[in-house]
A protein has these predicted regions:
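Conserved glycine-rich Rossmann-like NAD(P)H-binding loop of the short-chain dehydrogenase/reductase
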Residues: 12-27
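Active-site helix of classical SDR
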Residues: 103, 138
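Residue(s) in the substrate-gating loop at a strand-loop-helix junction
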Residues: 122
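Canonical Rossmann dinucleotide-binding motif of NAD(H)/NADP(H)-dependent dehydrogenases/reductases
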Residues: 1-15
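The beta1-alpha1 cofactor-binding region of Rossmann-like NAD(H)/NADP(H)-dependent oxidoreductases
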Residues: 43-53, 85
Length: 170
């Protein structure tokens, strides 16, 4: 989903910044989009410092943030009684806390631009999925938090929304 968004936004002429834990994937994006307005950086969204550094680097490169798409996410497959608590924590750290961190540091710029904050969620944020308890919890948390943020920013001109794509091969 993220790669496709980057490619479509670049085709439309947008300035695009993206981060990933995978430097090889970022390098391939750069190679496949020479001369584009693309900024990439290795960062782990589950790490608050990485998120702050990424947003600061985006500001140095593009001066502002108009749209923030919180797309990073992982899943898990195990019934709760078999699931590792470390795995559930990792899912929450990436799927929920990564959104909180990136939004926290981008929000002042988005407010200046009256921009958009988008979260990529899942039907699991509305209906718990068996065998994916940690994933479902992360998406319920994401949607609840984004609904609260949307309400807080309702009169500010900032749009807050989330999308729930179906199963995607990535």
């Amino acid at each position: 989903i993220g790669r496709a968004m980057v490619e479509e936004l670049l085709k439309a002429g947008a300035n695009v910044a993206t981060c990933s834990r995978n430097s090889d994937k970022l390098y391939q994006l750069q190679v496949q989009n020479p001369g584009s307005k693309l900024f990439t950086m290795v960062a782990d969204v589950s790490n608050e410092t990485d998120c702050r550094n990424f947003i600061n680097a985006v500001i140095r490169n593009f001066s502002t943030v108009d749209i923030l798409v919180n797309n990073a996410g992982i899943s898990m497959r195990a019934e709760f009684h078999e699931a590792s608590l470390d795995t559930i924590r990792k899912v929450m750290d990436i799927n929920f806390w990564g959104v909180v961190y990136c939004t926290k540091y981008a929000l002042p710029y988005i407010q200046q631009q009256k921009g958009d904050i988008i979260g990529v969620s899942s039907i699991a944020g509305y209906r718990g999925l068996p065998g994916r308890s940690g994933y479902s919890a992360s998406k319920w948390a994401l949607q609840g938090w984004m609904e609260a943020l949307r309400t807080e920013l309702l009169d500010s001109g900032v749009n807050v929304m989330w999308v729930c794509p179906g199963f995607t091969s990535s």
